[in-house]
From Swiss-Prot:
One of its GO terms (cellular component) is spliceosomal complex. Residues 1-14 have a biased composition (Polar residues). The gene is snu-23. Pfam families: zf-C2H2_jaz. Residues 129-190 form a coiled coil. This is Putative zinc finger matrin-type protein snu-23. Residues 1-22, 142-217 are annotated as: Disordered. One of its GO terms (molecular function) is zinc ion binding.
Length: 217
């Protein structure tokens, strides 16, 4: 019997014609349309591409001083070949951007995008009692250190003032000694003049003192 003459279970068992599951292919078509729409939205910027979440550290206090004063008052020659970091303003090497003024620069480095680029989240760690105690201890140590530094600075100022007073004292003493010597020489010269005035005129003439005589003849 030929294939086309078979019927019933025999015919169904030897059916080589491919069958289609309409429900399965309908769902696949819908999913394909959704994927195409999502890709188009991502391309147009209507939707962000799903990326694996990156574990970021908690927001921490900055451990360095932000340099806002080093370029104040300086002039810079800018050409087409000048790197972005030297074109004026404040350059952020993390985000590779230039901010023109200090206020916006601080807003930038404290902002979400900059913190994300350095691996930080905007969440802060909740402080425990131990953290608070440790913070108080650090602040106390800092104050004591600053107090000692202030005492050392005051001691140095006192030493410098004392050295300046000693220098002035020595200078005044030296000036007084010179004045005293001049006065002594002057007194000695006056005494010599008085002694000479008591000599006999003939003796004064013989000694060559006649020109200093003030007596009248």
């Amino acid at each position: 019997m030929s294939f086309y003459g078979q019927s019933g279970s025999q015919a169904s068992g030897t059916n080589h014609r491919r069958t289609w599951d309409e429900k399965e292919y309908s769902l696949a078509a819908q999913q394909r349309l959704l994927d195409e729409k999502e890709a188009e939205d991502i391309r147009l910027g209507k939707k962000k591409k799903d990326e694996p979440k990156v574990k970021r550290e908690m927001l921490q206090a900055r451990e360095y001083k932000v340099d806002l004063d080093s370029k104040v008052g300086k002039s810079v020659v800018i050409t087409k070949a000048t790197p972005s970091a030297e074109t004026g303003g404040f350059y952020c090497d993390v985000c590779d951007c230039v901010v023109k003024d200090s206020i916006n620069f601080l807003d930038h480095i404290n902002g979400k995008n900059h913190q994300r680029n350095i691996g930080m989240s905007m969440k802060t760690k909740k402080s425990t009692v131990a953290d608070v105690r440790e913070r108080f201890k650090l602040m106390k140590d800092k104050k004591e250190r600053e107090k000692k530094e202030a005492q050392v600075e005051q001691l140095l100022e006192d030493v410098q003032e004392e050295e300046a007073r000693m220098a002035d004292f020595k200078k005044d003493k030296k000036t007084d000694n010179r004045k005293r010597k001049r006065d002594t020489r002057k007194d000695e010269e006056e005494d010599d003049d008085e002694d000479d005035s008591g000599l006999d005129p003939e003796i004064r003439a013989m000694m060559g003192f006649s020109g200093f005589s003030t007596s009248k003849r």
